[in-house]
Amino acid sequence: MKFRESKNFSLTSISSEIQDFWSKNDIFSKSFNKKDSSSFVFYEGPPSANGKPGIHHVMARTIKDAFCRYKTLKGYNVERKAGWDTHGLPVELGVEKELGISKDDIGSKISVSEYNAACKKAVMKYTAEWESLTRQMGYWIDLSDPYVTYTPKYMETVWWLIKNISEKKLLYKGYTVQPYSPAAGTGLSSHELNQPGAYRDISDTSVIAQFKCLDGELPVKLKNFYPFYFLAWTTTPWTLPSNTALTVGAKIEYSFVKTFNQYTKKRITVLLAKNLIDKVFSKNFYKIDNENELDLFNQNDTKVPYFILESCKGVDLENLKYDRIWEEAPLPVDNPENAFRVILGDFVTTEDGTGIVHTAPTFGADDYKAAKSAEPEVPPLQVLDEKGNKVPLVDLKGKFIDNIGLISGKYVRNEYYESDSIPDKSVDVEIAIKLKEQNLAFKVEKYSHSYPHCWRTDKPVLYYPMESWFIKISDLSERMFNLNKDINWKPKSTGEGRFGNWLKSANDWNLSRSRFWGVPLPIWSNEEGTEHKVIGSVEELINEINISIEKGLMKTNPYSKFNIGDMSDDNYDKVDLHKDFVDDIVLCSEKGLPMKREKDIIDVWFESGSMPYAQIHYPFENKDLIDTKSNFPADFIAEGVDQTRGWFYTLHAIS
């Protein structure tokens, strides 16, 4: 059999001919304008046009296109609305780099208005490249009427959703220890930390620190062992100066052990969980059966003997006092008399460490909860800054405050330094060296473990005390878990395995982001924080501003040219809901007090998860599309597996 050979065969020419044919004959729009055809609902995950498309976008779009074309050929109407994700950290960090500024410069070297204008310009930088790729690969998506997340209509729907959540009593303000990215200058939500690759294996300096027990109110059964040290293990030595408690398990058995400090060679008695003695006293130690053999130890010996004494239960240790380990650190500003004592916690285990947990309430979620639940409550180590505000020993840049000894003004992690100014010794190493010299370090060694990193800056996160607005996901987790069973995941293991199990114990959603370019939290509060007003629409905001004008809190209404009820784009172009506009608006509380907007913007993942509603300006327009379920929920979504903890999660949570 002979096959005809085309000598002038050109894939490029054929591609152009097909594209021209589709364009001239309006084939794409005809494909989803079939009368009396059932709809197949597809949601397009919005890319950001501030970066160029990559090969992974081609792969994802190929899968999307194949299924949508198949359903079209089966007779369905398959509308495919394009979208642009225009807010968030990727945009802001790119603009900061381009302008040669940092977050701290915004509001001083450059106004918030100028900064947001630069972000708005940058976010559509590569639109032409995206549209070109879309055409070249034959991906059918409606680029003529995309949803754009920075538009007033989209933002208004996001506000409406927040108000709706508030009316369901699922929105609250809380002061908690939460993931925080010093490099990005903002808090993070738990689902952001569960992005693939967020946890990375790193090697840190770990310390088993010696906390010297005070003899003030020792029970009779423990007096015979005085003086002794509590042994507590940490993989974050930089948190030791902020220690205010040691946590033990009430039912755990703890043993007193006589030995020598391997660095100072001083004789010491230490206390740790009985089940962990063999693990802690490994390598450079050996067990003896007669206490008198300790007298045979020579300071030049390479191996250190230890002798096990009697044991007690964790409950016997409750409220014992100890010497603070970092003398240069100030006392807590609140109730210092309740600090530096042993408390009980049900999270303490004997799987690793020493069975005694170093507790710094300012830098650990479990630490914070344990300190709060203790009676009396253990205070966090906070001091007053120059403005009289309570702050921890580490600032929002990840740097120690001044006047706390050799660590003053240093970053808690070397990754926070500029590449040309990284010190030879990290703060962890410096702290370990000092504790060795003071006979307060029992063991110092490298420890490999998994540690969370910011998904956008690739820098390690801190757990930091902050006030934020949360969605009470914990009240919804069971329903979310059960509804997840109705989703037809491909492969099943993706949704029903790790993701499904994660939903069972999902944490409350931290909405607050300390940034500038995004949808502002639509919450106004009085100075005392006792009254709050959540705004759910442009109309509501205009009406509230008019009340403020009547009460003398504002002179003019910045949105006076907006015509309520007119849903045209031209009318909505008269409104800007971004931070640089709404932050100047003062509302009036029910008691007649001035109310200012809460300073943060909304987590950009909430924006993208609002897409089913916001893309059609629900409920202000197209209300029937959602209410009749003709355009909700989606029949088909296809994205990378990383979106199980991103867009898929937020779509699920918001719905």
Feature map (PLM): residue ranges:
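Non-cofactor substrate-recognition interfaces
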Residues: 2-13, 32-144, 220-230, 237-655
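Gly/Thr-rich phosphate-binding loop signature of adenosyl cofactor/nucleotide-binding cores
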Residues: 169
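Acidic/polar loop patches that form or flank catalytic/metal-binding clefts of enzymes
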Residues: 172-175, 442-444
